[in-house]
């Protein structure tokens, strides 16, 4: 099937500086690339906005007819007290914020929250632990019970809990875990300005272990942490050269929290998030692009542009770990006003 009028086929090709082309007609035929360069991706990020939106929408409509959006709910099972020194995070023991360490939520309480999320319309339940890494023992056994319970409710189950061993990944897969989240946060070049307690290679190794266990990969990053556009292109390059691409790519905007080293950083221009989402959609056509933290500060119009140009999931609920999120009713109205259907798996 021809995606657009062949008479304007040449305008449906994006020319890069090295004289190569990205033919948007070929994407529908399964031409998924894993050899993107940072230069190519930056050229896409820098396109005139209307041109970028048009190209992204071609890909988005091709893979997501009807603009269906998955609603995911996120619960912080273990909040605060993390030994990592992530400069953006209010849960780090290195940052003097109002977030205090809390005990791990019990299994039944987590499953109650999962039921409530399902009743509210979510079909993916994500659980977060503020840990550097998973340790074997009672807490991990409880995590396995939570995963099994969430799956028995008919929900997808996602966990984010830091680094992981091969054995732990296998046990989570046996419990039915749908996805494991482990973000790269930023580019390899900018990474040392954000965190020193874990290497970039540590993160990539965690992703490898998740993939080898047969669990789908959820991996994205954060913009607005003082990085350049080239850094954003470099982050996307790392993601888009993974083979296969991550099934889920959360795109976050920094929420500057008082007491963190990034407390004084200004909010990004909402159109920067639109550009990031649109570019991610173009280079990773089959991945689910998740509009994640920082969504509240974007405004309705920018959120709709993100949904139009590539985002096909939002985190749904009043809180994301320790930061605020649009209220459930506001999200329902947003999706209804945009004519978007939720959910799909």
From Swiss-Prot:
PROSITE patterns: RADICAL_SAM (PS51918). One of its GO terms (molecular function) is 2 iron, 2 sulfur cluster binding. [2Fe-2S] cluster binds at residues 126, 158, 218, 290. Its EC number is 2.8.1.6. Keywords: 2Fe-2S, 4Fe-4S, Biotin biosynthesis, Iron, Iron-sulfur, Metal-binding, S-adenosyl-L-methionine, Transferase. Its cofactor is [4Fe-4S] cluster; [2Fe-2S] cluster. Homodimer. Catalyzes the conversion of dethiobiotin (DTB) to biotin by the insertion of a sulfur atom into dethiobiotin via a radical-based mechanism. This is Biotin synthase. It comes from Prochlorococcus marinus (strain NATL2A).
């Amino acid at each position: 099937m021809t995606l657009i009028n062949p008479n304007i086929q040449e305008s449906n090709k994006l020319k890069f500086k090295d004289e190569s082309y990205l033919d948007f007609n070929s994407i529908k035929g399964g031409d998924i690339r894993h050899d993107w360069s940072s230069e190519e991706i930056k050229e896409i990020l820098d396109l005139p906005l209307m041109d970028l939106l048009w190209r992204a929408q071609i890909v988005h409509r091709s893979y997501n007819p009807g603009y269906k959006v998955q609603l995911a709910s996120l619960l912080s099972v273990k909040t605060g007290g993390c030994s990592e020194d992530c400069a953006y995070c209010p849960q780090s023991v290195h940052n003097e914020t109002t977030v205090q360490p809390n005990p791990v939520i019990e299994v039944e309480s987590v499953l109650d929250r999962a039921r409530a999320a399902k009743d509210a319309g979510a079909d993916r339940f994500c659980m977060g632990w503020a840990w550097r890494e998973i340790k074997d023992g009672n807490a991990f056994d409880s995590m396995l019970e939570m995963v099994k319970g969430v799956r028995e409710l008919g929900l997808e189950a996602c966990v984010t809990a830091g680094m992981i061993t091969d054995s732990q990944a296998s046990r989570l897969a046996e419990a039915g875990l749908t996805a494991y989240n482990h973000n790269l946060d930023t580019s390899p070049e900018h990474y040392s300005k954000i965190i020193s307690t874990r290497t970039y290679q540590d993160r990539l190794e965690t992703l490898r272990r998740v993939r080898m266990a047969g669990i789908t990969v959820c991996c994205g990053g954060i913009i607005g942490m003082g990085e350049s556009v080239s850094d954003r292109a470099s982050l996307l390059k790392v993601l888009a050269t993974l083979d296969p691409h991550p099934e889920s790519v959360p795109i976050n905007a920094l929420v500057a929290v008082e007491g963190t080293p990034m407390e004084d950083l200004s909010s990004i221009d909402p159109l920067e998030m639109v550009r990031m989402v649109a570019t991610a959609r173009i280079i990773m056509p089959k991945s689910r692009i998740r509009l994640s933290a920082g969504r509240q500060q974007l405004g309705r119009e920018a959120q709709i542009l993100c949904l139009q140009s590539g985002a096909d999931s939002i985190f749904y609920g009043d809180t994301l770990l320790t930061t605020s999120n649009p209220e459930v009713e506001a999200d329902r109205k947003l999706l209804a006003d945009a004519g978007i259907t939720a959910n799909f798996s």
